[in-house]
Amino acid sequence: MGVTDIIKDFDKLKGQKLVYGSQGKTSLDAVPILAFDMLGLPVNVVYGMKGRKAGRAAILRGETTIDYQTTASYLKHVKPLVEKGEMVAVMTWGAPSGGEVSRDPNFPDLPAFPEVYEAVTGNKFKGTEAKSWTALFYAGFATQKYVMLPKSAKKDVVKAWQNAAAAIVNDPAAMKVLNKKLGKYDQVTGSKALKSALKKATSIDSKSEKFLQSWKDTK
């Protein structure tokens, strides 16, 4: 494609035949699909992928031309290809920071989606579309992999699990392994922090919800 910088080469990217292999519009893929629309990229979304592994295989076979992978998958499977010059990483979805979506700390040299949006559209990352995308982002990426217990679990059992999670987060040896495999992100532990994160991941304003319902029906 000849695209190495999504902002500088954006017009070149828009002129390409872009095909994305998706798991479904109500899956995590709602995040990239809406992002493509917001950027005005002419992406042909092909449904039927069984997972991002299948999506990765499709782009490696040349069946698709644009893809995304989670940090863990990228570090293990895609980064070596980037280093060989066989793939190009152009942006991340970002990471929560101070109430905003900023650059992912694991990829500080890559712009986050909100940054790309503002640069190529000339608009601030605000309004219903931006709020809708951010709600999807928090639900799909920023807060995930919760450890859940039955509501009937006794307090001492809940406390034991909370203490175990905190012990892992505070164990440098354990975190070294996790950070290497999954990427270095802040881990959420403790009842208060978890409730706050869960609320953000499961809440959406009515205007954004209405927009997403309508948008989904067009895909």
Positions of PLM-derived features:
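Hinge/capping helix and adjacent helix->loop/strand transition within the periplasmic-binding protein
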Residues: 1-61, 122-131, 140-177
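C-terminal lobe and pocket-closing loops
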Residues: 6, 77-169, 210, 215-219
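Ligand-binding pocket segment of bilobal, Venus flytrap-like solute-binding proteins
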Residues: 16-118
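Sec/Tat-exported extracytoplasmic proteins
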Residues: 39, 63, 71, 82, ...
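Mature extracytoplasmic/periplasmic domains
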Residues: 94-104, 113, 166, 174-198
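Extracellular/periplasmic bilobal clamshell ligand-binding domains
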Residues: 172, 189-219
